[in-house]
Amino acid sequence: MPIIVDKEKMRMDILLAFQRCIEKKPIDKVTLRDIAGEAGMSHPKLLNYFENKDALVLSYVKYTREFMTKHCMEWFETHSRKEYESNLAYMNAFMKYVADAPEGELRPNATTQTYILGHYNDEIGKMIREEFKEWRSVMEGCLRSIYDGDIGREEAEAMMILISGTFICNYNGALTGEINDNIIGNIANLAES
């Protein structure tokens, strides 16, 4: 009797192997053979799931979009604004979550490398722009629910810039972590000065 293979699970295993490869060397230097080896399969077997590296990268960008959207929504759904003394405290708590991933949350940390690829590959670039559009829309909805509709697209986009910058700095180990519990408060200090 033939073994039944969960194709989606295999694809996810390959995407996670791709992510591990990217932690070892730049995305443009990672080959399908590297990924297959990391996934514990042959190169021809990997090609049953992804026809080429671009298809794999596009799937990774899609995975990233879905992951970020889902986790952002979950954070806001499980953290009531009423539990915090102010909007500033609430948004600082969210940014602390962004800066300090909870243990066991396997974030797609190679996302920042795909942002660069998007500049050189139109299809990947389009997918990344769609990722940001969806993510911004989700953020706008979350912010509107907190601020009773007084917040719009611009504030959501500002949060996207802040979140993306935090991810990029974390990926490179550039943050000290000393301000992770008051990121927005420190930005507010600039506006008040």
Where does each model-flagged region fall?
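Helix-turn-helix
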Residues: 13, 17, 21-55, 59
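Hydrophobic/aromatic-rich alpha-helical bundle segments in the mid-to-C-terminal region
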Residues: 125-129, 145-191
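Solvent-exposed, amphipathic alpha-helical segments
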Residues: 13, 17-24, 71-74, 110, ...
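Short, basic, alpha-helical segments at the C-terminal edge of helix-turn-helix-like DNA-binding modules
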Residues: 62-69
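Residues in soluble alpha-helical coiled-coils and helical-bundle/repeat scaffolds
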Residues: 5, 51-55, 81, 99-103, ...
